[in-house]
Amino acid sequence: MSKTLYLVQSPFSATEQALSKVQNLYQSGDDVVLMGDAALYIQHTFIQQLACVFVLEQDAENIAAILSSNLETISYARFAELCLNHSRCISLK
């Protein structure tokens, strides 16, 4: 079981700061979901260093032109599974 699931749900203007917080807290085995405007930060240096970053299918439509090898688009059902498979979930807004 992974340890922490980070849900980055911040408005675009606050996403840089939210990702900085995640970067400071992130440990091996943790996962990150970019939601809403935060998905536009898919090319952020920290995000690119992750083996995998999750984006909801609806949010992925906004970044369709941006290719990222570590991006995994997920349905709401898969999102629910992710939440249940982690011992804690932290939302950054």
Predicted features along the sequence, with ranges:
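N-terminal beta-loop-helix "entrance" segment that forms/cooperates
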Residues: 38-49
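Long, charge-dense
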Residues: 43-44, 59-63
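Short, solvent-exposed amphipathic alpha-helical segments in soluble enzyme
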Residues: 21-26, 48-50
